[in-house]
């Protein structure tokens, strides 16, 4: 048994892929010779098929951890595994980016000069493993499943921000990834659009059962979407506590009115506030 802090399996299905295991990971930045420890001996397991919400103070190292999983940044020490296969470790400090892990960015990454359907089809077309017809058939089908029928031949700038977010998620799923990595994807959306996107994401998740590693500062978002929350410490980043969200899936927004939802919210807010105050006090001392 790994020493990693482990979340309970979200789904009892041995066929699911995308289990993440993070073992004793350290990340140290060294700008101008001044070492900054961003991640400090982080241990965590995320079972395949789980929606894992990562919550913690701003600047604590959450995105650094996501970037290491994605293969954007190296780690200083430790190991990260995907389905028991090494992504990065002592002999390989930086993971190879791959179609099995796809990032949905905070600021979006659609090509504005391509139509939405062409954006969705772009990745598989570049890979060249399927025929163009098969790729576009799949793209049309997935856009329809995501409520995007009628938007296929529009450009990203011609649809709402919420619909653009859906297009980005569909594009991310086109290569059948094991893991979707979200870095505050709905931060810029208004509350009503964000609510619609939450329910749309869950609908997409229920159909695809992909592992989701999702960074957010929005506690309501975290509890509504997640099977459980990983509360991170102030910098350097490591898990402080796992909060189980024992509200059955599928969910809709009626769960927000339940006493149990508010109980989880109170527990989570207390934990995050404690770490945010530590981060603030550390900043005051540094200043």
Model feature map: region roles:
Residues 31, 87-105, 126, 132-136, ...:
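ABC ATPase NBD coupling module
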Residues 132-151, 203:
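Conserved ABC ATPase "signature" region
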Residues 117-126, 136, 140, 244:
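Short helical segment in ABC ATPase nucleotide-binding domains corresponding to the A-loop/adjacent helical element
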Residues 154-157, 175:
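Conserved signature/switch motifs of ABC ATPase nucleotide-binding domains
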Residues 55-57:
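The feature captures the beta-strand-to-loop junction immediately N-terminal to the Walker
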Residues 70:
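Helix-to-loop junction immediately C-terminal to a conserved catalytic motif
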